[in-house]
């Protein structure tokens, strides 16, 4: 069986084959007229120089052929509103108004499992993987335009273009809340993030300052990321910063 032998029109291909065969698979998808691909396969930039060369070739083929792909090295995507589950594990969250963007597939799946266990709805999930073509900021911009999305949860290991990310985040946070968890607070965590997806982790303090300037709510743990972002899907956007807090205790 081949992609070309499929009689129907195909909207999305999910690729899980070994990395060395991905370039040909993308060429087959382009020839078939498939516009989008979820590239779950690993063995690219995250493995070193040779994998980086292969990843660049895959991106060149996709861009030249007008094909958009997410990944590689991604767990996949979910759209409960579109009844789509294109991920590597059997997991089916309840529909909701929360969009989750995660640069870690394992953590993303854990957050969704928590959401299911706690009865929280998830409208969209996107594991970005190595972000060879589609970036976290692209997905953030997209979810910013979707009326079904009331809040966005963002797990970041690093970004390749801080200015572009800032511009996107500022535009989105004007209309809906964005909550972010940045990994790499310690030297060990920063090194682990870079080896996982090949991302540039950067200074934790720099990211914290960037989040503040962009209007992003920063949290410290994965459970906070889910709890805060899910709560915000049920709350109206504040009309001003004139908020007072009254407490019974002084501690």
Residue ranges with predicted function:
Residues 1-251:
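Catalytic-core regions of core metabolic enzymes
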């Amino acid at each position: 069986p081949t992609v070309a032998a499929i009689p129907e029109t195909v909207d999305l291909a999910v690729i899980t084959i070994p990395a060395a065969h991905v370039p040909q698979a993308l060429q087959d998808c382009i020839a078939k007229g498939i516009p989008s691909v979820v590239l779950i396969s690993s063995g690219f930039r995250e493995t070193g120089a040779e994998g980086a060369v292969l990843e660049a070739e895959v991106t060149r083929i996709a861009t030249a052929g007008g094909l958009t792909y997410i990944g590689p090295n991604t767990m996949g995507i979910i759209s409960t509103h579109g009844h789509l589950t294109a991920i590597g594990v059997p997991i089916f969250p309840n529909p909701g108004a929360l969009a989750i963007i995660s640069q870690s597939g394992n953590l993303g799946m854990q957050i969704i499992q928590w959401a299911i266990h706690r009865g929280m709805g998830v409208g969209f999930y996107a594991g970005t993987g190595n972000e060879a073509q589609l970036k976290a900021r692209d997905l953030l911009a997209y979810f910013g335009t979707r009326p079904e999305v009331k809040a966005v949860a963002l797990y970041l290991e690093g970004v390749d273009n801080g200015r572009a990310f800032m511009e996107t985040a500022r535009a989105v946070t004007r209309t809906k809340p964005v909550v972010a968890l940045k990994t790499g607070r310690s030297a060990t965590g920063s090194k682990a993030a870079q080896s996982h997806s090949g991302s540039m982790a950067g200074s934790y303090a720099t990211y914290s300052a960037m989040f503040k300037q962009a209007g992003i709510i920063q949290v410290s743990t994965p459970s906070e990321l889910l709890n805060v972002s899910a709560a915000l899907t049920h709350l109206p956007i504040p009309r001003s910063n004139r908020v007072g807090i009254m407490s019974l205790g002084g501690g």
